[in-house]
């Protein structure tokens, strides 16, 4: 029960996004616990028979992962011709994940390995992160010259890591977060 005793969920604001722009179900907005869980446990071994680890895994799925999916879906819904994709990778190869990510891309770009990402990150930039990116690993279909060109354009248009630090979360709600993410997406 460590996870539920340590964190005070009474301060979590529940907000219904009901503007014409972002019709939504009832969903808590991100809070510091959604970021802290990755800072505290990201990269650590997950023991499937350990009750504490099971609770942490459930928390990650129910809160930061669900909120990331909601964020991405709302952004994709706001951009004609875009869709989102998210794998529920709250743990990888027996270790807690370092982040929650969802991809948003034009339907026609699905197999081009170029996309926007939104989510919680604890590794490079701690907080909520949104950016234009591309598949950088060996599985990428992009040739090296295209990867270099993508990097150049991302820097040139300031589409790299945009971070909202945990200390700034009180300045945001779903509408504001979705709007700034959509604005970034529309610059491409």
Language model features by range: what are they?
Residues 74, 78, 153, 180:
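Residues that form generic nucleotide/phosphate-binding pockets
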Residues 2-113:
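Charge-rich, low-complexity N-terminal segments
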Residues 99-103, 107-109, 115, 144-149, ...:
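Conserved, charge-rich beta-strand/loop surface module that forms ligand/interface-binding patches
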Residues 173-188:
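Long, compositionally biased interface segments
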Residues 2, 77-89, 156-170, 187-188:
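Short glycine-rich, low-complexity/disordered patches
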Residues 124-173:
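Compact, glycine/acidic-enriched structural inserts
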Residues 114-116, 128:
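Residue-level detector of short, conserved catalytic/binding motifs and their immediate flanks
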Residues 119-123:
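Short beta-strand micro-motifs enriched in acidic
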């Amino acid at each position: 029960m460590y996870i539920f005793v340590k964190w005070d969920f009474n301060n979590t604001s529940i907000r219904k996004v009901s503007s014409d722009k972002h019709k939504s179900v009832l969903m808590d907005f991100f809070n510091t616990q959604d970021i802290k869980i990755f800072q505290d446990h990201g990269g650590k071994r997950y023991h499937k028979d350990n009750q504490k680890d099971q609770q942490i895994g459930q928390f990650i799925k129910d809160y930061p992962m669900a909120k990331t999916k909601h964020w991405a879906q709302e952004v994709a819904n706001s951009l004609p011709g875009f869709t989102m994709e998210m794998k529920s990778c709250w743990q990888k190869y027996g270790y807690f994940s370092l982040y929650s990510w969802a991809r948003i891309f034009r339907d026609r770009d699905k197999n081009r390995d170029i996309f926007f990402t939104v989510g919680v990150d604890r590794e490079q930039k701690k907080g909520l992160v949104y950016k234009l990116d591309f598949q950088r690993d060996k599985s990428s279909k992009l040739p090296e010259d295209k990867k270099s060109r993508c990097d150049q354009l991302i820097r040139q248009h300031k589409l790299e890591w945009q971070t909202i630090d945990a200390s700034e979360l009180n300045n945001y709600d779903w509408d504001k977060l979705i709007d700034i993410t959509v604005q970034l997406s529309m610059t491409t």
